[in-house]
Structure formats: structure tokens, C-alpha cells
Amino acid sequence: MQQIDIFTTPIWKALLPQSVDTQWLIDLAYEKKGTNPLNNCNGWQSFDQEQEMSFAFPIPQGLKLQQFLDDCMNSIAKELGLPMVSLLNYWLNINPPGAYNNLHKHRNALLVGNLYLQVPDKNSGGIEFVRDDDADYYVPVDANYNPVIGTRHIINPEQRDILIFPGWQPHAVQTNKSDKDRVSLSFNYGAIK
């Protein structure tokens, strides 16, 4: 029998090349946290960098990073038959031990990404993707997971991993159960009009 997949939701994973320095972003996160201690579920997020539409600080590291992310995002957009995309905004996240992020979506973003800058270990909080339908009510609790009937999927990222997914995909960040901070860069891309 033929299976026809509809409404599939892929998650793309890339690895940031070692040639792209990220220490300056980790330093920037802690610097911004010191001047703007916003709180989010025991963690910290910088405000959306809507006025700074480039990662080009410092050059050349920022330019290399943005070019790599732009290429990844536009490759995915092309694969999906979408128009070219560009950076809408980005923010830094510091999740110390005990921090997490509630289930949410990224409205107004076509594609969303997260670059994991500092990942102490696999206990520092995986990203959990959740179906946005009623499958939980129909699928038996003891059913084996597969992409068709699965209702939750957890990815435990490693340092320098980049995860990309559609903005409408609900997701949460699990509690950091390690003894060190996890630091990441989140970013939204939208269609070029």
C-alpha cells in the first residue's frame, strides 16, 4: 500500500564550521545580561535585536556567521519552494541550571533557528517539539513512537549544532539539569518581499 505524507514538519540540523568563531557571542550574552537582566523561566533572554539586523560585530566573525546562517535558511526555503528569506531578528539566551522555556511558536517567522553556543552536557535541556493537533487524545499511550503517530520529539543538541524549523512548530526547552549554563542564539527569518 502506498503512504502519502501530508503536512510533514521537518527539522533541519547543521553543524557550524569550526572556522566560525562563537566565543564573542557567548561574551556578548554575558555582557548584555549584566546590563539588562531580563528573566524568562529562571533563564535570561536579550531583547529582540530588531534594530541590529546584522551579526557583523566583530568583523569578520559576525559576517561569517550571518553568511552561513543566510545560506542555510535560503537553501531550506528553496527546497520548500518558498521565496528567499532574510533575518528578521535574533536574541541571545542563557539558561542556567533550573531554567527552561515554555511551549511557544514564533509568529511572523517563516523559519526559526537556534545555534547552540555552549552546551555543558545532554542534561542541559533538550528542545522538545510538540504536535499542534489532537493526536494525544487518539494515539494509545503505549504505542511505539514513529513520525506519523508521535506527538512529542526531543532533540538534545550539542555545541555548535544549528536546528532550524518552521515558525509555526510548537516547541519548548526542557529544564537545564546540568550544573553549568547553556548559551544559545535564536533567530527568525521571514520572506523577502
Please provide the spans of the model-predicted regions.
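Non-heme Fe(II)/2-oxoglutarate
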Residues: 1-82, 100, 182, 189-193
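A short coil-to-beta-strand element that immediately follows conserved catalytic motifs
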Residues: 81-90
